[in-house]
Amino acid sequence: MVSTSALEVGIDVGGLDGCIIVGWPGSVCSFMQQAGRAGRRHGESLVFMIAGNDPIDQWFVRHPESLFGSSPENAVIETDNPYIVARHLICAAYELPLTSADDDLLGPGVTAMCTVLQEEKRLREEGGAWYLAREEYPATQVKLRTASEENFTILELGPDNIVGELDYVAAMLSLYEGAIYIHRTETFIVEEMDHVNCLVKIRRTKTGYYTQVLTQKRVTVTDEWDTREVCGARIRLAEVEIRTRLTGYKKVRFHSTENIGYGEVHLPPLELDTVSHEISLDRETVMQSEEHGPGFLRSGMHGVARLFRDLLAIRAMCDPGDIDHHVDDNLIHIFDLYPGGIGYSELGHEQHGEILKDVLEAVVECPCVAGCPSCVLPGASRIESSLESEVMEYPYPKEATRWLLHRLLGLEPYKPELHGVPAPVESPLNPPAPALDERVERKIRKVARLTSRGNRG
């Protein structure tokens, strides 16, 4: 019997003696649920996990104690996230009227949030209690897997069959016109994206390639929660605005991963208000990296960012796709891919040092020489939109990553073994400027915004 991961939800099929799990299923809980489908009636069972080449799969192969010694229920959730709380309040009001006495159950601020929902005509107030304003069943509008309010339906032209559904963000990143959509091993080309009706039209087409979207990200800090100095850097936990512009897509040949062409994407930017764990490399780290040539530090930053994300996902019991990262100048951002944040970045901030130790261990234990998809390079199993061509083009990303990790952990300086790397001709990054007085910085930013408006006129 072959099944998708849906089998893990508790269906008792009975009579199974073994289970083969292909690739890490995403969390310890999912692994135990899938493994638990076998041996339910007749004693012992046998479970195999066929590991992929992603860092998480390889981590559990080398560290089985992380699997069998982990609690499957230690999930991370941000209960104060207004995106989550507002949806729960609306659903709760359908069951029973809400009052200020519910602060003990639902957390402080229920009254204030209900007032806002009343202004938005989702709740109505009568006699100090809030009721649902409309005759509806609100739970049908609450997504369990995403905070997006919109889902795109995927329609196959010809037979006019509905083949699937994707949330708004995933659709923007993978179902743009010209994209290749893969469904049940068949390839389809996206012919039209109808934003009005949230409909994507695809046509079955045999291709020898798949597509990857190209993006540019801009991260703006809107509120700082915590900051502290660590070895080689300053780390900060902050609310951020992530603006992602889709610049185009590339066509990648199956199996060889050869780039065979590009296409244009004409879609509006994606905006996300979330929480980020920021690693700001100090001036000394940037300056010391210069002796190893151009591209060295940037490549190391990408390697650290990718592995930090994956190993944070293990601790947070989430899919790596729930976390993203961005490298810009001397900054590494690790942020939640969920509006308002859901607690993953906060865990990364709290356990910064411990996760970096895991990252170094993963790099050292990988048997490759220069870097591979099991450690610092992007893998073919999922989109790695933040790992740009620079990390692929630098010949020794593993050595660069290892050097940077020694700096960030305060270990004895690591001497990278670089052969054939071009001699340094210029600094790979501009060293960060000394910090401005906060009031001065605000004034400069204000002037920049005002002059920008003037140019538009």
Describe each PLM feature range:
Residues 51, 74, 93, 97-175, ...:
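Extended, highly charged accessory segments
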Residues 6-7, 16, 24-26, 52-53, ...:
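Short, ordered loop/turn segments at secondary-structure junctions
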Residues 12-15, 31-34, 43, 58-63, ...:
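Short acidic, glycine/serine/threonine-rich loops at helix termini
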Residues 9, 13, 22-23, 27, ...:
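Secondary-structure transition/capping motifs at alpha-helix termini
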Residues 1-9:
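Conserved two-lobed SF2 helicase motor
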Residues 19:
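Hydrophobic beta-strand segment of the Class I
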Residues 27-78:
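Conserved segment of the helicase C-terminal RecA-like domain
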